[in-house]
Amino acid sequence: LKEMFPGCIVTKNDANDIQGLPDLTIFYKDRWATLECKKSANEKKRPNQEYYVDRMNEMSFSRFICPENKEEVLNELQQAFES
């Protein structure tokens, strides 16, 4: 992420703070996004994860990301940050 978006700030969110909040928040220029990282597309979602990903996607950009969709999600993130 730091190579794709020079100067961005990436924070790892504390799962104990708000249950279901996405794992990463990325701040880039005047934009932000969140990513919920999964080891695979089949990994089980925890309580509230879908709610927060959907809600934050309405506000800005948020996705579940895993090895199977990594390239697609990063391309979408790049488009969101450039729009």
Task: Outline where the language-model segments fall.
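Catalytic phosphate/metal-binding cores of nucleic-acid and nucleotide-processing enzymes, i.e., regions
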Residues: 1-83
